[in-house]
Amino acid sequence: MAGSGTAHLRPADDVLLRVENLVVDFPAGRGRKVSAVSNISFDIAPGETLGLVGESGCGKSTTGKAIMQLPRPTRGEVVLEGTNLAGLSGESLRRTRPRLQMIFQDPISSLNPRRTVADIVEEPLKIWGIGTPEERRKKVEEVLTAVGIDPVAASERRPHEFSGGQCQRNSIARAVITDPEVIICDEPVSALDVSVQAQILNLLEDMKERYGLTLVFVAHDLAVVKNVSDRVAVMYLGKMCEIGAPDDLYARPTHPYTAALLSAIPIPDPEVDVDAEHHVGGELPSPINPPSGCRFRTRCPRAEELCAQVEPQMQPVADGGSHFVACHFPLQPVEPGETAVGAPAAE
């Protein structure tokens, strides 16, 4: 069940990026607020890809943008190599921008339609005063070639003259041009055809190895996330439910919501029965007035009175290694001696 806690965090010296107790609220008028992200924590080691999954409205894209400080978190820490980005402002924050970049969902609208692609890719270098004009030109040619775009065509054509897949390649080139450490990939293939998706995913893996990147991969396609991620975190209504290595999490889903997501993946075989055991009905509750205790309890077939009273905390799954879950009544055993019980739910 959706909860909080930091038991799953690794030692600070082992990670590049650490997000702890992150909260992102938006005003909703009449003194109300939308709780988009509510007290979640996770970390990412250098060279790792963390997949963030969940249904629409769970807060995964907002989490990615909050890492970028766009928007600024309401509370919590985003620590990049010992520096809390949430505590920076002005020029100090601005100077961290080259270290974190983003690839957006819509590859065409994320590029300036009035400029050539080569100019768009070069712009970050100009902003930061990196290199001479000739050095910048060579860098742009190098990166465009690496993503599979002809530099000559890029210098002559604007975004609308490229296909969607080519525009996403251009977006990737723009993201890596400043040699960032972390790239937030916000559903980078969801707007593309299936055949093109595979090409872009392979390109991201290639660029990750070539430039030593660390990725946060936001997506709703569980099959895609499994293939590209080193760890997967499942979110529901602004909370984190479960986190672990993809092979472990997909083979032994321990949170009822994770099991429901996996059971919803269509199997192209008419002889295979639909998994009704983990079916979840109903609608996502309002983030303006989320349920007390566990936020998933209103749709969970295993929910009991405790779930309404106490928010569950992250706890290790038995024999799960780096597999953690926040649930009072998990589908798999948890480590003996641990407890999922957290603070009482707010009235």
Positions of PLM-derived features:
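ABC transporter nucleotide-binding domains
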Residues: 1-251, 263, 331-347
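Short catalytic/signature loops enriched in Gly
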Residues: 2-15, 29, 33, 243-347
